[in-house]
């Protein structure tokens, strides 16, 4: 009889254990000397990779519990307005255990793309998503400007990701051709973690150990730039979302970022339906606009993973790939902890199928 799991996170833990078949398939070193060389070089490479990731991260605790509660009530209002259908179509993107709310600027990604792969993401035409709510400016952005984390006028894109327990977002790099750096995120409702360099595998679903594990506390601000933003993927694993968690992601779009044109809006409508003010859309219809069912956490296909089923392996551009010791070649565990980051500055195996990641 097959094992029964009460939660997807238990299934992931079970699947991450090596099966005898997988162990037999692993390549054995040709000699004891080769084995010693590999054992000696891999930890050094892991430490170097983790050091590079750390160099691109700043993290600080900025919002008090009372301030968090005030912002969280505003996030609940956003959810309520979306449930009532008060936002534009492309403002809201729903998936099991994860809803996204785009403000200021929205863009195509994942299963919405006609052509998939890095560099294919496009901004929506101006006005296709709702403006950034006033409370985001007043309660969040203003504080970041006052603390000189970002310059005034930097943010023109705000995304709220609302996760339920067991939710996740697969490994990705925020599209470099769409967004300037840094990438700023503020966490609410509960503690979680951000993982760098993980591999996601599907059928069965499993997630590798990260190159670097970064605890993320409620009320904390995380700033990614340099290596951490551009040269390695980041993700949120299902096992790291134990309670509801929301994150406000604040970014600036590039002036030269490609944008969909209204006249080319697509193909899912028949010509006879394009009368009057009806507009075509170049996007595929969204998979679902319904809320996740209560038992969604126990299903094997979760969140954005269902959008990744047919994706090719998406790593970084060729010129940025490393032939050895890259985050996409090894499964690693970080021994670092968030307490090494302060407010004051910069100190602040083998899967069955290819890794499925995407720029996001």
UniProtKB/Swiss-Prot annotation:
Kindly list the positions annotated as binding 2-oxoglutarate. 161, 163, 172, 234, 245
Q: What class of enzyme is it?
A: oxidoreductase
Compartments (UniProt record):
Nucleus speckle
What segments bear the compositional bias annotation Basic residues?
281-290
Presence of the UniProt keyword Nucleus in the record: yes
The job of this chain, per UniProt, is described as: Dioxygenase that specifically demethylates N(6)-methyladenosine (m6A) RNA, the most prevalent internal modification of messenger RNA (mRNA) in higher eukaryotes. Demethylates RNA by oxidative demethylation, which requires molecular oxygen, alpha-ketoglutarate and iron. Demethylation of m6A mRNA affects mRNA processing, translation and export.
Write the Enzyme Commission number(s) for this entry: 1.14.11.53
Named cofactor requirement(s):
Fe(2+)
Q: Name one GO biological process term.
A: regulation of mRNA processing
What note does UniProt attach to the cofactor annotation? Binds 1 Fe(2+) ion per subunit.
Segments of this protein annotated with the region Disordered:
1-53, 261-360
Q: What cellular component GO annotations does this protein have?
A: nuclear speck; nucleus; paraspeckles
Describe, as the record does, how this protein assembles with itself and its partners.
Monomer.
Protein's UniProt keywords contain Nucleus: yes
The record's listing under InterPro entries reads: AlkB-like, AlkB-like_sf, ALKBH5
Organism of this sequence: Xenopus laevis (African clawed frog)
Q: Which cysteines are joined by disulfide bonds?
A: 198-235
Q: Which domain of life is it from?
A: Eukaryota
For this entry, the protein name equals RNA demethylase ALKBH5
Q: Which reaction does it catalyse?
A: an N(6)-methyladenosine in mRNA + 2-oxoglutarate + O2 = an adenosine in mRNA + formaldehyde + succinate + CO2
Task: Select a single GO molecular function from the record's annotations and give it.
Answer: metal ion binding
């Amino acid at each position: 009889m097959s094992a029964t799991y009460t939660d997807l996170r238990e299934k992931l833990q079970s699947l991450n254990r090596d099966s005898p078949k997988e162990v037999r398939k692993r390549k054995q070193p040709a000699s004891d000397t080769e084995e010693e060389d590999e054992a000696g070089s891999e930890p050094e490479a892991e430490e170097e990779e983790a050091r590079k990731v750390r160099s691109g991260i700043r993290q600080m605790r900025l919002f008090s519990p009372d301030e968090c509660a005030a912002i969280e009530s505003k996030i609940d209002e956003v959810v309520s307005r979306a449930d009532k259908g008060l936002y534009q179509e492309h403002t809201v993107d729903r998936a099991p255990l994860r809803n996204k709310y785009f403000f200021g600027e929205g863009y195509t990604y994942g299963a919405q793309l006609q052509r998939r792969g890095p560099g294919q993401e496009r901004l929506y035409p101006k006005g296709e998503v709702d403006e950034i709510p006033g409370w985001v400016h007043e309660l969040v952005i203003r504080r970041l400007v006052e603390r000189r984390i970002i310059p005034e006028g930097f943010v023109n894109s705000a995304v709220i990701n609302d996760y339920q327990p067991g939710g996740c977002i697969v490994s990705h790099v925020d599209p470099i051709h769409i967004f300037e750096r840094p990438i700023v995120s503020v966490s609410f409702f509960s503690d979680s973690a951000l993982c760098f360099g993980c591999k996601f595998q599907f059928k069965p679903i499993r997630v590798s150990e990260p190159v670097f594990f970064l605890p993320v506390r409620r009320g904390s601000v995380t700033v990614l730039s340099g290596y951490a933003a551009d040269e390695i993927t980041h993700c949120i694993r299902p096992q790291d979302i134990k309670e509801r968690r929301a994150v406000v992601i604040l970014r600036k779009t590039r002036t030269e970022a490609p944008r969909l044109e209204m006249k080319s809006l697509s193909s899912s409508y028949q010509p006879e339906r394009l009368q009057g003010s009806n507009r075509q859309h170049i996007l595929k219809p969204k998979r679902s606009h319904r809320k996740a069912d209560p038992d969604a956490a126990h299903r094997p296909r979760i969140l954005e993973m269902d959008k990744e089923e047919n994706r090719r392996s998406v790593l970084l551009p060729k010129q940025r790939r490393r032939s050895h010791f890259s985050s996409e070649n090894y499964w690693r565990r970080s021994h670092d902890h968030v307490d090494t980051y302060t407010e004051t500055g910069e100190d602040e195996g083998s899967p069955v199928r290819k890794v499925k990641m995407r720029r996001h």
